[in-house]
C-alpha cells in the first residue's frame, strides 16, 4: 500500500534491529521506567504463533517510522471449543511522528490484511480512546472474559473487534494472552545492552 509519501510493507530481516530500536524509542518510559516491548518483539518473531504475513512497517519518505505485528491466539469457549482469533502488538510509532494519525493508518491496514487471511476476531489490551477509533469495543460486550481477572474487576483495558461479522455470535469464553508476551526483566536488561544507553525515569502516568 502506498499513498502520498508513505508506504506500508512487510518487515525485512535486515531491518529487525532497526525496528526493535523504533519500538524501544516508542515505548521508553511510557508505561514503566524503560520498556520491555522491543525485547518482546525480538522474541515473538520466533514464536510458533507469530504471523509473518502481518509483520508490517510504515515507511515515510524512506524512513521506517512505525511497526505492528500479529500473533495467533484462541478464545477458550465455555462449550469446550477453541475459537481461533488473533492479537497484535507491539505497535509502535517513533515519538516525533505520534499523534499524527500514522498509528491508525497502520493498524487499519493491518486489520484488513488479517481479515483477508481469514481472521474472524482480534482481542488485545489497550486504551479504548485510541483503539475505539479502529473499531474496537470492550471484550465483555462479546461475553469474552480476560484470563485471571476476578469477576467484578475493571476489564476496560480488554478490547475486541470482530473482523468477520457474527464470528463471535453465541460464544462465551476466556482469552489468555499468548505465552510469548511474557518475558523476564533480567532477559530484557541483557537485551537492552545491545542498544544505545537511555535513562530510565519514573514518570507520572506509568502503570508499572
Model-derived regions, located:
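Conserved acetyl-CoA binding element of GNAT-fold acetyltransferases
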Residues: 80-95
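A short, well-structured alpha-helix characteristic of acyl/acetyltransferase catalytic modules
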Residues: 13-26, 170-204
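Conserved acetyl-CoA pyrophosphate-binding loop and the N-cap/start of the following alpha-helix
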Residues: 97-109, 119
Amino acid at each position: 500500500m502506498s499513498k502520498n509519501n508513505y508506504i506500508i510493507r512487510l518487515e525485512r530481516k535486515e531491518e529487525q534491529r532497526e525496528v526493535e530500536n523504533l519500538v524501544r524509542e516508542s515505548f521508553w518510559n511510557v508505561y514503566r521506567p524503560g520498556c520491555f516491548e522491543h525485547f518482546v518483539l525480538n522474541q515473538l518473531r520466533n514464536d510458533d504463533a507469530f504471523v509473518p504475513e502481518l509483520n508490517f512497517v510504515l515507511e515515510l519518505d524512506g524512513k521506517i517510522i512505525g511497526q505492528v505485528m500479529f500473533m495467533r491466539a484462541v478464545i477458550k469457549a465455555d462449550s469446550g471449543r477453541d475459537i481461533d482469533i488473533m492479537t497484535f502488538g507491539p505497535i509502535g510509532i517513533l515519538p516525533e511522528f505520534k499523534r499524527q494519525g500514522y498509528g491508525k493508518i497502520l493498524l487499519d491496514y493491518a486489520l484488513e490484511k488479517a481479515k483477508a487471511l481469514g481472521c474472524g476476531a482480534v482481542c488485545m489490551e489497550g486504551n479504548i480512546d485510541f483503539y475505539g477509533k479502529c473499531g474496537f469495543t470492550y471484550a465483555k460486550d462479546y461475553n469474552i472474559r480476560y484470563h485471571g481477572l476476578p469477576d467484578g474487576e475493571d476489564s476496560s483495558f480488554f478490547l475486541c473487534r470482530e473482523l468477520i461479522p457474527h464470528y463471535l455470535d453465541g460464544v462465551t469464553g476466556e482469552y489468555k494472552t499468548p505465552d510469548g508476551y511474557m518475558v523476564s526483566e533480567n532477559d530484557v536488561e541483557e537485551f537492552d545492552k545491545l542498544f544505545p544507553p537511555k535513562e530510565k525515569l519514573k514518570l507520572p502516568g506509568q502503570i508499572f
